[in-house]
Amino acid sequence: MRHFAIPTLFTLTLVAGCVGEAGGKAVVAGAGPDDLLKLRAGPGLGYSVIMGLPDGTAVTRRSCVTEVGQLWCRVSLTTSPGIVGYVSADYLSAR
């Protein structure tokens, strides 16, 4: 039971932290000056890329899910709210 409780608590803490920010503003950070963060059709690397987002792109978090040990957030672009997709939470910074 002890081995199960600690990873579960850690995962719930990560997800709760992101879900608590649903509707919160964030910016893309850490993609690098010559790279783009991929906005995907679903939460994982197997989903198609909708578009690339440079560092500094403003987004609104909608929700977050864990997929294969990676936290993914469903976001919309602040300047174009109709554009919605998933990005790795590792590349989002609170605004």
Where are these regions (language model features)?
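Sec-dependent bacterial lipoprotein signal peptides
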Residues: 1-18
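Basic side chains
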Residues: 2, 38-40, 74
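SH3/SH3-like beta-barrel superfamily modules
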Residues: 53-89
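Intrinsically disordered, low-complexity segments enriched in proline/serine/threonine
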Residues: 9, 90-91
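A short beta-loop-beta micro-motif enriched in histidine and acidic residues
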Residues: 46
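SH3-family beta-barrel domains
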Residues: 18-43, 51-55, 62-65, 69, ...
